[in-house]
């Protein structure tokens, strides 16, 4: 069925290599005989979620099935596997440990059933094993070191032994075991500085973390030496040099390096959204950090180790409307494109708004981290991943720095291109004020997709778009008056506004010149996915 045409899409009569003034036209040029190599899938290696217990919910599982199918995510990382709401550890009256893996089994079995694997964050501390009362978040995650490192070692050994027995050695060798989460932030590790300044306390916290790391990796590898253990899982790419030096000096394995990065001007932790965040106007934000860490690893004893950014996003608080806005899709694609092979994975934080660090949220759109909101509504950020997952297995060389052009085994071609514009006015304006409003995207002129050395014949051309008021569910919600609770009719309206249906679906012909050329109007932060499917 012919869809309404929402774009300027005129077949161009001139040959696909005809010159155009650079200032007048953006040209995305690809020759199907010029291959760059296999399409990188580092973008969907892993995705984040809030905490393990949320993974027992039907709506969480429904949403993960959806993003697994449409975006191709293979691993998932979450906090709280060892929190008391997972019931993993108690002690009897004599202080003997009691282990219980029933909730863990339920969650991991579900992941196995949909073809995903856990990227296992080993934390937080079970209450009965904790050395202190300090907690974080609404769900009271204990952030203190173990009261007895030998009991911690035995606990980790028992846990790893259990999953090995349940899923098999060969399977667990494909998992990752990450020691703790953001130990360079007092809120996540130790819980108190004891009156010391941050500078005075940092080496104390780091020393205690390395004790935890050493104990944990020995426990994991006592089950199987080939199991992968890494860290330091820090905020802001912190403690990288220190961790590389410590593990090298002690002869400890560091099978992978993990850390986090967010594109904000300052800060690392704000679960309640009270501080106010500011999106960085540095186009190299996140990208520069990743490349710097990879470079330092390459000069270390761990040059062969993988680099996993196990959290990243535009902002580190689940109360930032930039997460809901149309700006997010182009932001994500810009980072994925420019980071490239510097990271083994970039695990977006998170796939869902079902996220309870500050407790259940009271509105359908509140600046949550998720690609999907509570009602399964697809945000613009979701489409960045869905579009990436539509790319074929072979990437073509392309002259445009904000594009991927790929082909698949069936003879199809996919072109994904975007504009990444940072509209944030001045640092004095916080995200919570700027991105909650309706901001019209300015026109950027046409982009022309030119393909050469195509097979002659008829193709079905599908064009998909995300941008301002195009699969822009936040704008549609604003149009409804920003209701705090949604009726079924309103959900249906919003679902229709973010359906992801093609805005153009037609047949096109590639003639004897083997060229295809088409123009598409671009606005700020528009994203286009063009698919050409051969018709037999």
Where are the regions a protein language model picked out?
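Short acidic/His/Gly/Ser-rich catalytic and metal-binding motifs that mark active-site loops
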Residues: 84-88, 127-136, 184-190, 264-271, ...
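Non-catalytic accessory regions flanking glycosidase/transglycosidase catalytic cores in CAZymes
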Residues: 9, 16-176, 196-236, 250-252, ...
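Acidic-and-aromatic substrate-binding clefts and catalytic sites of carbohydrate-active enzymes
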Residues: 50-62, 84, 95-102, 185-187, ...
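Glycoside hydrolase catalytic-domain groove-lining segments
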Residues: 63, 258-259, 264-320, 335, ...
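Hydrophobic alpha-helical scaffolding
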Residues: 279, 283, 321-329, 371-375
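Substrate-binding cleft/loops of secretory-pathway carbohydrate-active enzymes
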Residues: 233-259, 307, 312-331, 335-340, ...
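Sec-dependent signal peptide recognition
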Residues: 2-7
């Amino acid at each position: 069925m012919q869809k309404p045409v929402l774009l300027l899409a005129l077949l161009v009569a001139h040959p696909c290599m005809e010159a155009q003034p650079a200032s007048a036209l953006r040209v995305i040029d690809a020759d199907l005989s010029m291959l760059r190599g296999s399409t990188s899938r580092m973008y969907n290696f892993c995705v984040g979620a809030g905490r393990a217990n949320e993974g027992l919910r039907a709506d969480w599982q429904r949403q993960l099935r959806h993003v697994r199918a449409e975006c191709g995510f293979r691993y998932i990382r979450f906090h709280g596997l060892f929190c008391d709401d997972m019931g993993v550890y108690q002690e009897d009256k004599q202080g003997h440990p009691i282990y219980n893996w029933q909730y863990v089994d339920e969650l991991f079995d579900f992941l196995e059933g949909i073809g995903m694997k856990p990227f296992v964050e080993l934390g937080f501390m079970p209450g009965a094993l904790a050395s202190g009362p300090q907690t974080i978040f609404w769900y009271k995650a204990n952030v203190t070191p173990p009261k007895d490192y030998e009991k911690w070692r035995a606990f980790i050994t028992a846990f790893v032994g259990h999953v090995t027995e349940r899923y098999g050695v060969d399977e667990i060798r494909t998992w990752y075991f990450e020691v703790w989460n953001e130990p360079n932030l007092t809120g996540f590790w130790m819980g108190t500085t004891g009156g010391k300044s941050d500078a005075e306390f940092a080496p104390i916290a780091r020393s205690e973390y390395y004790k935890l790391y050493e104990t944990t990796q020995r426990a994991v590898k006592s089950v199987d030496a080939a199991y992968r253990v890494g860290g330091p899982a820090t905020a802001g790419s912190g403690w990288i040099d220190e961790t590389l030096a410590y593990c090298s000096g002690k002869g400890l394995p560091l099978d992978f390096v993990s850390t986090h990065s967010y594109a904000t001007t300052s800060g690392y932790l704000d679960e309640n959204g009270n501080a106010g965040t500011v999106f960085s106007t540095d186009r190299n934000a996140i990208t520069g950090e990743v490349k710097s860490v990879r470079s330092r690893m390459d000069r270390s004893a761990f040059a062969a180790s993988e680099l996993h950014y196990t959290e990243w996003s535009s902002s580190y608080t689940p109360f930032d409307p930039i997460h809901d806005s149309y700006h997010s899709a182009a932001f994500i694609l810009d980072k994925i494109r420019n980071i490239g092979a510097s990271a083994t994975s970039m695990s977006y934080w998170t796939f869902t708004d079902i996220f309870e660090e500050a407790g259940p949220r009271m509105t359908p759109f509140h600046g949550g981290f998720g690609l999907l909101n509570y009602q399964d509504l697809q945000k613009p950020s979701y489409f960045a991943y869905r579009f990436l997952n539509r790319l074929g297995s072979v990437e073509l060389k392309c002259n445009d720095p904000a594009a991927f052009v790929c082909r698949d085994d069936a003879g199809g071609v996919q072109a994904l291109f975007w504009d990444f514009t940072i509209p944030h006015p001045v640092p004095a304006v916080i995200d919570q004020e700027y991105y909650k409003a309706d901001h019209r995207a300015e026109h950027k002129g046409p982009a022309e997709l030119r393909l050469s050395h195509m097979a002659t014949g008829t193709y079905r051309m599908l064009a998909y778009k995300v941008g301002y008021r195009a699969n822009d569910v936040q704008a549609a919600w604003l149009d409804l008056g920003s209701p705090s609770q949604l009726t079924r009719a309103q959900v249906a309206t919003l679902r229709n506004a973010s359906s992801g249906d093609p805005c153009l679906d037609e047949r096109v012909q590639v003639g004897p010149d083997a060229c295809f050329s088409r123009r598409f109007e671009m606005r700020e932060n528009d994203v286009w996915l063009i698919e050409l499917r051969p018709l037999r």
